[in-house]
Every structure is written in structure tokens, then in C-alpha cells.
């Protein structure tokens, strides 16, 4: 994980072509950031609102005064979602199969669970991109076709049903997340989350309370956490019920609005 520009030296970004691999595009961004810094544009901001303590701490490291930052998590209207504490035998990966999302580590974990009845479902399909083809090649070479299911793009009632019947949601990210909607959405459905111990995920997913945390990029450790759902009867229900309760307490619309209004009035 690169934090080379965190303390204001943006020139390293040019060397790494951080803007979509474009040196010219990155150079323009660096010029803009240096200009913002020179004219002290952030000094004119009255207050910054972050969605998690992790992001707040990164802003502080980057030079923003702590007194100008508050943490207000995003919200979900859990009243519109009926939790389901029953489940079918599958783990669910939600979202795009981008490198930073760590999809490959969820797939690798299934090598250790070949002898179980559980499968990994991925809400996406294998595209013609080099990255997706490499993932599919890995699935084939390791004979995981019956353990890894690509469901294709899902939305609406189909997606709701897919989440509702999952044993848990898997978030194997290898890059910092801000406040993943996937996590609080899973909580609203009464589903525990198994996530990398990194960034805000390690903050939002409370280990052994609302889900389980594993070492980032460690597919064996992830498999061990998933194995617990195979062998520990009631684990998904117990963690899922805690997740739903915390969702209603910490990530509700009312809680969010109260915090925002308090900041605006201060």
C-alpha cells in the first residue's frame, strides 16, 4: 500500500503514473495539488466530515488539524430491509472483480474448502480483461469450477435474495476502503462480514462480534475463518444478529442526521 504522497510530496506520483497509468494525467493532478497547497485552499474549509476514524486519522497525518475533522458514518435505512438469519451453503463476494478488492484471495481460500458443501458466489461475470481472464485461468487450473460460481450482474430482488441467503459476505480487500456500503448493507440483512484486517474494514467489522477478520492477502487465514461457518453451528446467526443490532444503532438515518446537524450547529 502506497502512502508516498500523504505528507505533501506529490512528485512521486508522476514516477508511478498514479492517474490511470498516465504520466501526463498524473502530472496535471500533481500541479493541481501543489496549487491547492500553495494557496492554502484547505484552510478555507470550515470543517471536514469523514465516514470513519481511519480516514480521519489519515487526514490528520496529512496535515489537517484534528479539531477540524469529525467522523460521521454513512447510513442505511435498515427499516426497509428484512433481516434473514437462515442461510444456504455459500459465501458471497459483492462488487467488481478489481485487483484492489482482493477477489483472487477469496477464490484461493476455496482450495482449502474443497471437501465441504459450501461454495463461493461472486456477483459478477468473467470479462475479456486480462485480470479477469487470469482469475478464470486460476479457477480452471485448480479445478475450482464447482466451488466458485460467477452469478453474473445482479440487482433488485435477485440481489436481495442472494444476500439474504448467504452464510456471510466476504471482503478480502488489499487496499484501503473508506466506508464500504457492502458492509453496512450486509449488516442490515443480518449477515456477518469476513474482511481483511486493513484500514476501515478493521474498524467497521468487529471481530467475533459482527464478523471475522483475517490477515490481508492470506488466503489460508481467510479459509480458516470461513471454515468456522462450516463447523460452528449457529455462528452465522449469532454474528448476523449482532450485525443487525449494531446497524440499527450506529448506521441508521436518524443517527447520521443527528451527528451532521450537531456539526452544522457547532
Model-found features: residue ranges?
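Carbohydrate-associated surface elements
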Residues: 54, 75
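A conserved mid-protein helix/loop that constitutes part of the nucleotide-sugar donor-binding site
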Residues: 89, 98-112, 133, 212, ...
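Glycosyltransferase donor-sugar binding loop
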Residues: 94, 119-136, 152-153
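Short alpha-helical donor nucleotide-sugar binding micro-motif in glycosyltransferases
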Residues: 153-154, 161-166
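Acidic donor-binding loop of glycosyltransferase active sites
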Residues: 164-178, 191
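Short hydrophobic beta-strand element within catalytic cores of glycosyltransferases
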Residues: 192-195, 205
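Conserved acidic donor-binding segment of nucleotide-sugar-dependent glycosyltransferases
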Residues: 207-208, 212-219, 228-234
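A short, well-ordered alpha-helix in the C-terminal region of glycosyltransferases
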Residues: 221, 228, 235-250, 256-262
